[in-house]
Amino acid sequence: MKKDFYENVREHALAHAHTQDTWRTRFILARTAVFPLMLVALVHGYDRGSVEELMLGGFFLLLFAVLVLRHRRLERRRIFTQAYLGVVGEYLARFDGSWKKSPVDGAAYLREKCPPDRDLHIFGAASLYQYLCAAHTRMGRDRLAAALSATPQDLTRTRRRQAAVTELLAHPLLALELEARGALLPDAHDTRVLAKELAQPLKGSLKLISCIGIVLANACVWSLCWAIFFGGSWAIPIALFTFNLTMAMAFFSRTQRELAPLGHMASALRLYGRIFRALERAPLRSAAFHAILSPLFAPVRATIGLSRLTILADCAAMRRNFFFFILANGILLWDFHCMAYFSHWRKGYGAAAADWLKVWAETEVLLSLARVGHTREVHAFPRFAEEGAPQLMAEDATLLLLTEETATPNDAQLTAGTLVITGSNMSGKTTYMRCLGANAVLAYAGAPVCARSFTLTPMAVYTSIQISDDLAGGISTFYAELLRIKKMMVYSKRGKPMLILIDEIFRGTNSADRIVGAREAIRRLTLPHAITVVTTHDFELCDLGREGIPVTNAHFEEHYEGDKILFDFKMRAGRCHTTNAQYLLRMAGIMGE
């Protein structure tokens, strides 16, 4: 069971976190004990002129430095472990439904002119996006939103993503590690801004700045050495120190402006460096992943470039210390060297940085799509039927938004024509349509679908499920539905494959007009290049097949046990012969016995 796997991973991670907490306490106690011993040994040894005590103090100083470094490394690991536990918790949330509390629901990507976004719950609360999203960068989230489309995309890219997701499914622990490293990034981190800053060339003459820095720094260092070790005049090094510091102050505003990006990107650079190192050593050997990860290795290696830039960012950060600024610039013209090196880095690596960040954004998309396979016992990669009449064949299909324990699997054997589904209220008609549409969206994205097998023709999905009026626009619910069906008819004239899903057709008008309008709409939407699924409570629509229209019937039904109404949510062939509206009215206390 997949849930058992993630619970075991969590238990192991919790034990690891407990061990880290224990070692953290030990490091704190050790540092607290060693520091005063170091001070006492050094001060006492200096006062008494004792070489032995000074050596002991030096030993304690070295020991304290080692403890500090080990403590910092442990803190980084603790932070990663906490992020890892958070990611494991997100996976476990997919099994109990608590994932719907996630604030990242993709509501910002909802488009009013794209009904499937709401009808199929692609974006928004309790949506496909909310279930899937493992992205923490803005680019990754944007790419995931673009992938979740009701319109078929480039099948070459879809199949490449399928292959990459297949490989991720074989390495669930790697997926957890990568997601945990991504979770350490700032939420919705805009990598495009970072890429732009890294690629921005330095204005002015790099060679001049570099030459000035090298000449003056060397002159000051050599004059100091001459004065200290050979008894030379101090006038020259003092004059050079003053001149260098004056130069640094004169160019301060420019160096501050040029080096400013390093200040706020230092933390992100370290995180991306660790992410790219994890990707470099990951056992991802498929051709699909090789193509995705190739920018990390050529023309320049991402980990080497980011490592050098991280060192430069640390050097630039030292300038914030006033005393270091005075000494480093007076002797070495530190600012000039930092600015020259940053410009040199931009020329060598800046253009490639944008491609590195795109690699991670695409990896975030793949990690998101893989969540279906990581959390569903029954899943399959869809097969696309690109030739012949449209078809949608599914075995044991369920809706991703329902937990696997509560979802009832159903089959689909749909070809060109219309399927009219009847059944009682709450029997599962709308959920079945959403199941078909949502799995089609997952298929187009390159994700596994919630089914034992799934074959479909790439076809645009048009929906009319959640209809609402528009008071500001003066549009009633009925007219809003008419506009949607009109769009379906307009698109159908292109002759391209379509999957049309209409729930309770023309529910917003009286029964006589509804039946007349529905019959005509179904006639016009029953096409050789379209699969149309319509739910209704009007049994009259079940007779359209007798008029020579390729219409088939299916239904959901209920049964009663005492005063309880029960559903099995299984679709059956043929029309429905029962209703439950009066029973529900009595159950709600609206109608008397």
Model-derived regions, located:
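ATPase nucleotide-binding head domains, primarily ABC-like/P-loop NTPase cores
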Residues: V68, L369, R376-E593
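Alpha-helical coupling/stalk and coiled-coil linker elements that connect catalytic or binding modules
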Residues: M1-S424, T431-G437, A443-A460, L483-R484
